[in-house]
């Protein structure tokens, strides 16, 4: 009988130890936090259920059973290289967060690792981004597309590296965001993207004597002075240094119009301009009759 009392007392003590934290979600979250987010929620639930949802016993079981068999990768957070880091951002604005990380271990990372959201504010719908397997001591930048909350204030969230099997490793990466109506982070990143796009576009080769404000004739080569029609006949010659009557102008009709040439010679201009002379006459029909 006394043995039964001892067993009942032990069972009651076990139940009393779990009375303060009967919410399974709370226990799972606390289990994750104490392990430094090294185990997925499903893994935490497994150890808690195995120990009758006793948090202390579950942690002991995890270290006794899992730790000797786990080869955890290593990762160190190097720096935040986000464009405009430290600036506030307007509400409901897209932005990109970029972190520099390093594999500080002695082995290459396993395939399928990712940077995953683990707590706090998420900033958009993206909760993970795939990361390539880094060699030992290799450094890489990881970017995540985010969106600021719709209400002004201070926000924070946590991200961690995670293996394909759900094992978290490395430093916790914090996102601390100041949301203000007059924030400039979104504009800063847009201007930076425009500058990057402009610098990556191919540039045209411009000659030293090229004048962007001159007429097309000014930038042509000397051998482009003679103009010919598609049939090969010469239409005219561009004269650069003369402004006067065309040499082949022979006669004018009674109305002062020439049938054989067109001559432009306004007396009000004293500078040298180009003159186009048409050496071939126009041949009927004549809309006003032939003089």
UniProtKB/Swiss-Prot annotation:
A Gene Ontology BP annotation from the UniProt entry: negative regulation of tumor necrosis factor production
InterPro entries (UniProt xref): C6orf106_UBA-like, Ig-like_fold, N_BRCA1_central, UBA-like_sf
Location of region: Disordered: 199-275
Molecular function via GO: ubiquitin binding
Keyword terms: Cytoplasm, Immunity, Innate immunity, Nucleus
Compartment(s): Cytoplasm; Nucleus
Gene Ontology annotations for the cellular component aspect, listed alphabetically: centrosome; cytosol; nuclear speck; phagophore assembly site
Keyword Nucleotide-binding included in the entry's annotation: no
Biased composition regions of type Low complexity, renumbered to the chain: 257-275
Function (record text): May have a roles as negative regulator of innate antiviral response.
Protein name: Protein ILRUN
Organism: Gallus gallus
Lineage of origin: Eukaryota, Metazoa, Chordata, Craniata, Vertebrata
């Amino acid at each position: 009988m006394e043995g039964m009392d001892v067993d009942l007392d032990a069972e009651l003590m076990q139940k009393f130890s779990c009375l303060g934290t009967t919410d399974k979600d709370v226990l799972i979250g606390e289990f994750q936090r104490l392990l430094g987010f090294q185990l997925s929620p499903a893994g935490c639930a497994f150890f808690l259920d195995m120990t009758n949802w006793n948090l202390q016993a579950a942690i002991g079981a995890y270290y006794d059973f899992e730790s000797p068999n786990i080869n955890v990768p290593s990762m160190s957070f190097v720096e935040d290289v986000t464009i405009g880091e430290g600036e506030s951002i307007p509400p409901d604005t897209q932005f990109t967060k970029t972190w520099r990380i390093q594999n500080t271990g002695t082995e290459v990372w396993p395939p399928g690792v990712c940077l995953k959201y683990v707590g706090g504010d998420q900033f958009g719908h993206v909760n993970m981004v795939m990361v390539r397997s880094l060699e030992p001591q290799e450094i890489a930048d990881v970017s995540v597309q985010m969106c600021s909350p719709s209400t002004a204030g201070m926000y924070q969230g946590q991200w961690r590296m995670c293996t394909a099997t759900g094992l978290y490793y490395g430093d916790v990466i914090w996102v601390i965001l100041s949301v203000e109506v007059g924030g400039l982070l979104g504009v800063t990143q847009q201007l930076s993207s425009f500058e990057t796009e402009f610098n990556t576009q191919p540039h045209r080769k411009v000659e030293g004597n090229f004048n962007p404000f001159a007429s097309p004739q000014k930038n042509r080569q000397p051998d482009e002075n003679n103009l010919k029609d598609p049939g090969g006949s010469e239409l005219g010659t561009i004269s650069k240094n003369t402004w006067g009557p065309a040499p082949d102008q022979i006669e004018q009709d009674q109305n002062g119009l020439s049938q054989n040439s067109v001559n432009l010679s306004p007396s009000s201009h004293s500078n040298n301009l180009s003159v186009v002379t048409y050496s071939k006459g126009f041949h009927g029909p004549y809309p006003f009759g032939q003089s």
